[in-house]
């Protein structure tokens, strides 16, 4: 028994190591917290990723994690997961360190759906093409965007129904267009229409 914690890096390591080829994020930090909460995980640890972090040897990284997370019961990672300077650590080294520091290691096999391995790359590609049904299949949930309402032109007062301008956290978005959506505000879900793109013309 224990508390499940999802550990991630912020910013994405590729943004530090190869800024020009960094992937577009499917979820920002607050969006991640919201999605994890829906599946019962209430703890998200976003570790700062810096050039110094990238130079940390694999063994040192795990030792730092063990010291910071006592008592550490287990670590679950994908079989192809790597860590440490120049990706020198893999699941086999992690298992060795688990024996030394008394924590279990679980290797999670790839998830295959219709013969394809689910991955963030595949999901980003589906979203970029507007194939949100395919994105939802591999996400295990409906594709969603998350953001904060920002000041607009108050067009809702002219149209006779409420509108909201949302500054979204997502970096990977579907093509520009008008979408039928469900909008969540606090605990209420409402049917809505979303315009993704430039400021619409209202006649």
Regions found by a protein language model. Name each.
Residues 5-8, 35-40, 68, 140-144, ...:
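A broad, low-specificity signal for short, low-complexity segments enriched in glycine/proline
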Residues 2-70:
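Core alpha/beta nucleotide-donor-binding catalytic domains of modification enzymes
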Residues 2-5, 30-35, 137-140, 148-149, ...:
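Short low-complexity stretches enriched in small and charged residues
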Residues 17, 149, 166:
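Short clusters of hydrophobic/aromatic residues that line enzyme substrate/ligand-binding pockets
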Residues 1, 152-203:
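Phosphate/ribose-recognition catalytic cores of enzymes acting on nucleotide-derived substrates
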Residues 52-162, 186:
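Classical nucleotidyltransferase
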Residues 2, 41, 103, 141, ...:
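Short glycine/serine/threonine/alanine-rich loop segments
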Residues 49, 110, 168:
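Active-site donor-binding loop signature of nucleotide-sugar glycosyltransferases
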